[in-house]
Amino acid sequence: TDATLYAGVRPWQGGEVWINPEMDQGFGLSNTLGVAGFPSAEAYKVGKSNPYFRLQRLFFRQTINLGGARDDATATLNQFAARRTADRVVLTLGKFGVGDVFDTNRYAHDPRADFLNWPLVHAGSFDYAADAWGYSTGAAVEWYRGPWTVRAGLFNLSKIPNGEMLERDFSQFQLDGEIEHRHTIGDRDGAVRVTVFRNHGRFGRFDDALALAVKTGTAPDTALVRDWRTRIGASVNLEQAVTASVGVFARAGIADGQIEPYDFTDFARTAPASLSIPRASARHATRPPHHPTH
C-alpha cells in the first residue's frame, strides 16, 4: 500500500514546482521476483513490513509557448491548468520518472487505471533509468511543433543494477530520445512514438558470467563480470481511439539481450497489443503513473 501527496506551486508564468512525498508499506508477490513481466505494476523491487517514507518526485517544469493554435493544459496531478500553444518547449529538471515523459500511452501507462502487467505499462525492453522504486534524477526537454514532438533526456542510473541508490554525477547514465506524431483517423485521435535509449555503466555480459561459472564451478553471477559497457534499445508505441471510450494500443521493442538489463526488467524482445474498454465509471490519465522496476 502507499499514500502519496501531490503538492505544487507556480512561481511564475509557465513555471511549476512539484513534490510527491510518499509513505509505502508491503512487498510484491514473491518479493517481486520470478517473472520478467511482473503482474503488478504497483509492486516495487523492495519492500518493508513497516511503513516508510520516500521522496519520489521533486521537479521543476518550465513551458515556453512558441505560438500556434491554443492547446491549453487541464489541471491534473502534477500539472496546473495553463494556457499553452501547440508550438512550445517544455523543460523538466529534478527527480521524476523517465516514464513521466517517455513511452507514454493513453491506454496503457497507469497501473491504477489501465493495465497492471509491467510490459504493458512500459515497453518491456525499455531499460529506463530508475532506482528500485522507479524514479531517477535528470533532465528532459520536449519540443512540440504541430502534430510532432521530439524529446530528449539525460538521467542517472542506479549505482548498481536494480539498486536503491542513484548516481549523482552521471558517471553511469542513460540518454533517451523520442519522436512522436499525433494524427486522426476519421475523427478519432491517435499517436505513434519511437523511443531509443543508450545506457552506459558497469554491466555484466551473460556469456562472460557463464564462462566464469564453468571455469570456477560456481553459479553464474553477472555481478562478478561487470565492466564498463553500453547497452542500447529501441521501441515503437501506438495508440488509437476507436470510439470515445474504447481504444487500441501496441508496443514493440528490442534491446541487447547479451548484456544484463540495468534498472527495469529482463526483456530483450517485446510485442504486446490489446484493446482498452473501460468501465463506464473509469477515467484514464487521472494521475501520474507509478514506475515499477523489478
Q: Positions of the model-derived regions?
A:
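Sequence/structural signature of outer-membrane beta-barrel proteins
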Residues: 26-28, 98-100, 123-125, 157-164, ...
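Surface-exposed coil loops of outer-membrane beta-barrel proteins
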Residues: 33-57, 67-178, 220
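Transmembrane beta-barrel strands of outer-membrane/channel proteins
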Residues: 19-23, 91-95, 152-156, 192-198, ...
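Long, well-ordered mid-to-C-terminal structural blocks that present hydrophobic/aromatic surfaces
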Residues: 184-284
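Repeated loop/turn-to-beta-strand initiation elements of outer-membrane beta-barrel proteins
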Residues: 14-17, 66-71, 147-152, 185-192, ...
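Transmembrane beta-barrel architecture of outer membranes
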Residues: 2-4, 55, 134-138, 172-178, ...
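Residues on the lipid-exposed face of transmembrane beta-strands in outer-membrane beta-barrel proteins
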Residues: 5-9, 58-62, 93, 139-143, ...
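N-terminal regions that are enriched for targeting/export leaders
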Residues: 1-4, 8-10, 20-22
